[in-house]
Structure formats: structure tokens, C-alpha cells
């Protein structure tokens, strides 16, 4: 095992001492399933201490009120509830407790906004009389800043390079597979040519960013169309992201962030770019929502999330207290 691999494993083990529930989420991630249209999704019918899924891989909620209007909380892993110690402490479950609505968890780990709305379409919920709330935003920007192509029609998704390699293997056969395996060995031992610059040249960050906004606008239009057809409302909420908050970090948060940096050293460049794009991205999202007619809310401005309370399990995912705080802000600011 390389020194980097040992450091990464040690960082994960230390993290698990602080947030032991993350062991369950790591296991869930290792068991993800490839599914049509969405590309990948959570494993079906899972029962772990911190998280469970139904027969479709959708996370279960607690406190359902079948006689009440159904509402959807749509998004990626923060909506799914990575970091929560149980299904009862996710945002949708907390909203079931705090409102008179019946909230469903439409969160998908590592999803972009297109995958998020596709999940809504595929589920084909017949009676959605409550609001549609999309809590998202960080994954879209992160993926747009990563190397690789970004289509203004199809967008891009996490693990796309893995999918492209598998498609290439299927197309060219064993000889090309051998070449790719050898290239992988060369890369592992630092013998491969640097390809990052070439990958980025195929689609500059500026072009990827513009394409991402175009795709996001289309996704918001779809969300608004569904809301109008069902006679309800749609909202987009920019999720809280620790580097975008003027937050006093707790001892636990400082420790967790340091361990994450130790586990994934190369992510520091992405963090710097996310910070650089912050203000422009917030402005662009607000403009798109106003244009489409979707209500907009930025939780990174919320003073309640800037207090010296332990709210984050990592920079994107929250603790039980963090998810409860977000649920209460949604109820207040969206009049749920």
C-alpha cells in the first residue's frame, strides 16, 4: 500500500471516530447500483443503522402523513441525508414533523440537477399537491469546474470518465482493454503523461460554466412546469456549503475538514475555484430562478448557520443539528 493510500485510510478511520454514522454511508456508496437514465443510484431495500432505502433505492422518511398533501424535497446527497444518524433526522423527515405536509425524500447522492429532476419524472408520483423544493447547487458547479467535456444539452455527471472508459472497452475489445490497463499501471506509478491540461482544453471552464447554467435553467423550467400542472409551487434553495458561509467552525468541524483534506489532497484546487466562483454563481442562479418563475433562497446567507454550533459532518453534508436547522429555515423562509 502506498504512503498516500495509508494516509487516506488513516484519515477515514479518524473521521469515523468523530462521525461513526459515516461508516454506513460509505457502505451504501460502495454498493451503489447502475440504473437506466440516472446512471447510478442507491442500492435497493437496504437496512443499516443510520440509513435505509425502499425497493427503488429511495431513502425512507419518518413521520409520513398519508392523508396530507404530498410534497417533494429534491436534490443530491444533502437532501438524501448523508451524515444523519437515522432516517428520522434527515430534512424531509424533520419537515414531516414541522409541517402538515407529507414530505418524500428525492435526494440522490452525487446527482446533478438533471438527475434530480429525472428522478422526479421516473418516480411518476400521481398526487403531488404540496410544494416542490429543490435544495441543491454545489454539485452542478463542482462538476462544471472539473476536467472533461460538458454538454449544453446533456450536461455532465460524476463518474462520467468511468462510464466513458467502459463504453470504449465495449467498443474496441480486448486489445484496447489491454492498452488501457497498461496505461492505468503507468499512471499509478507516475509514468503516464499529464492529461489534465488536454482534458480541460476540450471544454474550457468558462464554456463548461455557461453550459451548466443553461442545463440548470432547463431543469428549473421542468420543475416549474410540473408545479404548474399540479397546481402547486416550486422553489430552488442553494444548499449551505461550509466554505461559502461566514461560519465560526467548531473543534469537530475543524478536525473533520482537516481529515478530508488529508484524504483527498487534490481537492484543494477545486475548493479554491468554488470560492472564486461563489459570488457570480449565486448571482446567476438567482437570475435564472427569477426568469423561470421559481422562488429562490440562498441558505449561505442565513445567520442561523453561521453560529459556532456543530452543523457540518463535512463541507457539504450536515449533522443532525445541521439538518434540523435547515429544515426550520425552509419552513420559515418558504412559508411551508
Residue ranges and their predicted role:
Residues 1-71, 127-128:
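N-terminal secretory targeting modules
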Residues 113, 117, 213, 217, ...:
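Short, amphipathic alpha-helical "lid/cap" segments that border enzyme active or binding sites
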Residues 78-85, 105-106, 209-213, 274, ...:
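Second-shell loop/turn segments in exported
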Residues 9, 19, 114-200, 204, ...:
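Interaction-surface signature
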Residues 53-133:
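Serine-esterase "nucleophile elbow" of acetyl-processing enzymes
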Residues 36-37, 283-298, 308-336:
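Histidine-centered active-site loop/cap adjacent to the catalytic His
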Residues 132-136, 192-302, 333:
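Conserved, well-ordered alpha-helix/loop/beta-strand core segments that scaffold catalytic motifs
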Residues 81, 113, 141, 244-246, ...:
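Generic structural signal for helix capping and beta-alpha/helix-loop junctions
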